[in-house]
């Protein structure tokens, strides 16, 4: 996967010093950012020109000590044709030699008012997300009480209907049917809709519903982290379901483990309310309140008390 320089400009604010149509279409293929400190001193053994070249105060200060043609010759090496974009942070002055080198190599030259470390972090985060490998899973992705919930289950079990009911109850839809899942960092999984299905829910017997048109902009969300999975399955009295909540299961997507809650579905059960309760219970556990442990402690105390009474 790749991100064009134009995509970068569309998402992050910069002051454009130099660009051309062809330069804006250059592709960024890595989220690693290059700060050419040693290169400005003439050491190019491990130079990686295909990365974004970011000039901070240190690189800029050294560059300004080099004068005349030497500065231009040095910048020509740093600003190679393979380089997608060069960015100068902290609104530092851009010398004419840098503009000339950008024109010669047809590289977009940008200026940012952000501090270098902050800009580095913003760029890396954006590129990590955009360049991450996508996996498609079947389900409904919702933001419920601020928790990213992926609702899965057999076809026809009522995932979309549950999602619609949750939207009516004030929660936000991210994706229905097809969810594009990607690993945002080593421990975080995120999901987003396919562009053609954005803001849409399919309800059997009704058809395609545009959630944003019917319920407003507050009922949809572009993407969310996936904090938990709720799996809907048909009720089977022969099957043992977790009744205490002390036997959580884990599912794995793209090497990231996500806790899963399995909910049996049968006539008369209000699935959307049960999903809300499961999410609130999940949040409570994250905050250190575990109803299962409280119950077990009470049961242990009761057993101990009964033994002492005998």
UniProtKB/Swiss-Prot annotation:
Catalytic reaction equation(s): [HPr protein]-L-serine + ATP = [HPr protein]-O-phospho-L-serine + ADP + H(+); [HPr protein]-O-phospho-L-serine + phosphate + H(+) = [HPr protein]-L-serine + diphosphate
Chain residue ranges for the region called Important for the catalytic mechanism of both phosphorylation and dephosphorylation: 201-210
EC code(s) of this entry: 2.7.11.-, 2.7.4.-
GO biological process: regulation of carbohydrate metabolic process
Pfam families noted in UniProt: Hpr_kinase_C, Hpr_kinase_N
Ligand binding (ATP): 153-160
Keyword annotations from UniProtKB, A to Z: ATP-binding, Carbohydrate metabolism, Kinase, Magnesium, Metal-binding, Multifunctional enzyme, Nucleotide-binding, Serine/threonine-protein kinase, Transferase
Catalytic residues identified in the record: 138, 159, 177 (proton acceptor), 243
InterPro entries reported in the protein's UniProt record: HPr(Ser)_kin/Pase, Hpr_kin/Pase_C, Hpr_kin/Pase_Hpr_N, P-loop_NTPase, Ser_kin/Pase_Hpr-like_N_sf
Domain of life of the source: Bacteria
Residues given in the record as Mg(2+) binding sites: 160, 202
EC class: transferase
Cofactor: Mg(2+)
MF terms (GO), sorted A to Z: ATP binding; magnesium ion binding; phosphorelay sensor kinase activity; protein serine/threonine kinase activity; protein serine/threonine/tyrosine kinase activity
Additional remark text: Both phosphorylation and phosphorolysis are carried out by the same active site and suggest a common mechanism for both reactions.
Subunit annotation: Homohexamer.
UniProt note: domains: The Walker A ATP-binding motif also binds Pi and PPi.
Function, as annotated: Catalyzes the ATP- as well as the pyrophosphate-dependent phosphorylation of a specific serine residue in HPr, a phosphocarrier protein of the phosphoenolpyruvate-dependent sugar phosphotransferase system (PTS). HprK/P also catalyzes the pyrophosphate-producing, inorganic phosphate-dependent dephosphorylation (phosphorolysis) of seryl-phosphorylated HPr (P-Ser-HPr).
HAMAP family per record: HPr_kinase (MF_01249)
UniProt similarity note: Belongs to the HPrK/P family.
Name of the featured protein: HPr kinase/phosphorylase
Organism: Lactococcus lactis subsp. cremoris (strain SK11)
Gene label: hprK
């Amino acid at each position: 996967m790749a991100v064009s320089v134009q995509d970068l400009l569309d998402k992050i604010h910069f002051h454009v010093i130099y660009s051309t149509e062809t330069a804006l279409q250059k592709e960024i293929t890595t989220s690693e950012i290059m700060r050419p400190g040693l290169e400005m001193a003439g050491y190019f053994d491990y130079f990686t020109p295909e990365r974004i070249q970011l000039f901070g105060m240190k690189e800029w200060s050294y560059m300004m000590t080099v004068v005349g043609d030497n500065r231009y010759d040095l910048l020509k090496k740093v600003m190679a044709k393979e380089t997608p974009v060069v960015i100068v942070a902290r609104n530092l002055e851009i010398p004419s030699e840098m503009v000339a080198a950008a024109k010669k190599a047809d590289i977009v030259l940008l200026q940012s008012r952000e501090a270098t470390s902050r800009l580095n972090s913003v760029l890396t985060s954006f590129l990590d997300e955009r360049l991450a490998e996508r996996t498609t899973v079947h389900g409904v992705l919702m933001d419920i009480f601020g928790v990213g919930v992926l609702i899965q289950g057999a076809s026809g079990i009522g995932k979309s209907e549950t999602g619609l009911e949750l939207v009516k109850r004030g929660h936000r839809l991210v994706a229905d049917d097809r969810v594009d899942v990607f690993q945002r960092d080593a421990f975080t999984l995120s999901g987003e809709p396919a562009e053609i299905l954005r803001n849409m829910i399919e309800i059997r017997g009704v058809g395609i519903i545009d959630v944003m048109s019917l319920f407003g902009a507050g009922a949809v969300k572009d993407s969310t982290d996936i904090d938990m999975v709720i799996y809907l399955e048909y009720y089977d009295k022969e099957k043992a379901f977790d009744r205490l909540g002390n036997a959580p299961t884990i599912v794995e997507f793209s090497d990231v483990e996500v806790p899963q809650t399995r909910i049996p579905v049968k006539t008369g059960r209000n699935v959307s309310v049960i999903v809300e309760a499961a999410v609130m219970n999940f949040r409570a556990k994250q905050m250190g309140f575990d109803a299962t442990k409280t119950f077990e402690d009470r049961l242990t105390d009761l057993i101990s008390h009964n033994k002492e009474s005998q």
